[in-house]
Amino acid sequence: MNKLKFLIILFITFLFNLKYINSLKQCKISVLLSGDWSDMGYNYQMNNARIKAESALNLEMSLCYKNLEVSIDLAKQAIEDSIKKGANFIVISSSVHTSIGYEYARLHRDKDIYWLIRGRGRPVPDDLPKVAVINFNTHLLHYTLGLVSGYLTTSGTVGFISPGPQILALANSNSFYLGALASRKNVTFLNAYTGSWYNPEVAYKASQMLISNGADFIGMSQDDMSVQKALMDSGKMALGITGFSNRLIWGSDIALSYITDWSDVFIKYAGHILNDTWPEYTDYYTTLAEGGSLLFDTFSYRVPSEVQKLVSLEIEKLKNSSYQPFRCNPMYSQINLNFDSNGCANDMEFKNTKLLLKGTDISKTINLGLYTIPIEFVDYSNSMKLGLTIVSGFCILFCIISMVLVIMFRHAKIIKSASPIFCLLILFGCIIIFSGCIIFSLSPTDGICGARVWLLSIGYTIFLGSLLVKNWRIWLLFDNPKLKKRSITNWKLYPFVAGILAADVLILALWQGLGDIRSESRIGIDSLTKYQYANVCSSNDQGSVALYILLVFHGIKLLAACFISFKIKAVDIEEFNESKPIASSIYIITFCLFIVIPLMVSPQSVASQVITIVVCAIVTTLISISLLFGSKFYMMATQGLALNQTFATNTKSSSFSLSLEKQKSKSNGLEFEDSDESEEKLPQIKNYSNSEIPNLQHNHSRLAHFSSDSCTSAEQDSKLDLENQNDENEIENNQNNQNNIVEDCQKVEKLEKDENLEKDENLEKDENLEKDNENQSIIQKKRLSKNFNQSEIDPDDV
């Protein structure tokens, strides 16, 4: 029986506790912030209060929405999302969203949802019993900091930055001015607007404007410290006006900070919800009194002790809510405010005024209005432009000096072999390239966008085109297996250079005409802010296609240069062989392309792209001309000019062809065809006395001088000596390796004695050699060998 009674009592107790637990309300906080909770200011303090309340009351969770000032729609979405997630205590922390808070409070008035809304008064009509209004008395805080500014200013000018009358009335601006006026009677006050609670860039720039006008202390109604950062960046002391203890971050640079602690407010009203004791139609007024959510931090040691004492005395007075020097001042009659019986401006008129006080006889106020950041043009840095211009100018000077040297020493053997006129064309093309680099470093305009591509492209075309054509001639002369007489003058080569240049100009014209090449201003590129812009070159899709074709065209020229470099690598006369410089130049250009192309594709700033292109153009061009001409000038300096000397070779890597014709009526010796300085021709051989053509044992051909010594068939070796009878004739005997020219030649038929020959000698005849019985000159084909004597070529112009 006793057990039954005990169980009944236990069951009743359980039901009672269960009913009590169910009767307890839950509280889920949702805070709407105008800015970011990491601003170390007002939004940070609000979010910090949410966290403290959640911890103090053991709440399961709470919500926070940030950066809602950007859009009213975002604030509405945040409220709807909060209600959807079960929040029943919604805090509207910014006066920007006051009306939205009242709107949704009315929309959900029948629901068990409570509201804490920052505003300047209760809603009209006041039909929202579950709404508590925070009256944030910032005026006394700004008055105090204005007092500090008036004491500390050295310029006599202070300023204030606020969102503006369309967002926030000018009560804070007037309060700050009255505080500064209380400590300095002749103070000058500057006022400016940003149009927003949170716009760091505009606030910073507006502060710089006030500083440039003499302000050394600036108050503000902003959610971050951008204004004070501008002061500190200029070497001045700042004020802590965000509700956070800013000295914890910036130390002694902060003269004084006010602090807001909203945790007591959050805990108080959340407790009312949990205990079901919500006070209807209430207002919360912030004060400097104990528990009033407002207090001042400690002074910086840089603030004089006398100033600290004076300000501290004023703070003690302000703890009495009846002491309101920021509102009770006869100067408000300047802006037609009404006064109460205590001599203070009407509270609502004071809080809502959009007019700035006019100052006194010795103190003036200047309203600079809404500040907007001017759109700033950002050009390439002067150091970049100056550096690229100087380097390019030095390279142009190097090319000009090289051109002068080529002209002065055009008769030197090493310069003749390189064709002076084409050397000048190559250097001229390089000058155009370096000029294009200078243009490339300038700020883009419609003209510059086209000119820089034209100059670089035409410069490379003249440079590579001249190099290709002049070495193509070397290849043709040395690669002559049929021993044809070839006369390739400069005038025959000019059309090829002109043709390559014409193709380049045609592609460029298509690019210019179809591509809509222009300079346009863009914002938001690279590291630019939304208030900065830069000029960039642009084109349409057709222009891009034409540009790709142009790149392919230049790529083909590089491949052609590779091919010709390979074909002339066997030329054994050093003065003619430019295979190594050409190959090295191509390697360098290709290497730079492997650097440039990935960099151009990868994200990088426009300035970085310009630097990459220009530096690669300068490096490749400068190294190329250094390889081509540096070695020539060095040989001239170390080995002499070698004027009117012959070219010589004693290697076996090249073969030369010689056309021999019998001339019966002329004297013995070697005769060359007449030619101008730019013409290359093969020599012609006249009558030979007491000579025979030797047996070609090594399957090589060469150009040699025939002597009058007899040769026997037993020796099978002859010494050949060709005597030059015409010093004015100009030739270029250039041929490539020909191993198969004389493989079937074992013996050469004996030459019929000329009337001037003194004796005949018989040579062994090869069974496989055709006889020439018509007393004609026999074509001699010989290749140089290490075992043969040295050959000589007359060095006129090649």
Curated annotation (Swiss-Prot):
InterPro entries: GPCR_3_C, mGluR/GABA-B-like, Peripla_BP_I, PnrA-like. It is found in: Membrane; Cytoplasm, Cell cortex; Cytoplasm, Perinuclear region. Disruption phenotype: Cells have tip formation delayed by 3 to 4 hours and complete development with normally shaped fruiting bodies only after 26-27 hour. Cells are able to form normally shaped mature fruiting bodies, however with a lower number of produced spores. Residues 24-388, 441-447, 516-545, 602-609 are extracellular. GO terms for molecular function: G protein-coupled receptor activity. The chain crosses the membrane at residues 389-409, 420-440, 448-468, 495-515, 546-566, 581-601, 610-630. It comes from Dictyostelium discoideum (Social amoeba). Glycans are attached at N186, N275, N320. One of its GO terms (cellular component) is plasma membrane. Gene3D superfamilies: 3.40.50.2300. Keywords: Coiled coil, Cytoplasm, G-protein coupled receptor, Glycoprotein, Membrane, Receptor, Signal, Transducer, Transmembrane, Transmembrane helix. The keyword Signal applies. This is Metabotropic glutamate receptor-like protein A. PANTHER family: METABOTROPIC GLUTAMATE RECEPTOR-LIKE PROTEIN A-RELATED (PTHR46924:SF2), METABOTROPIC GLUTAMATE RECEPTOR-LIKE PROTEIN C-RELATED-RELATED (PTHR46924). It is a multi-pass membrane protein. Residues 410-419, 469-494, 567-580, 631-798 are cytoplasmic.
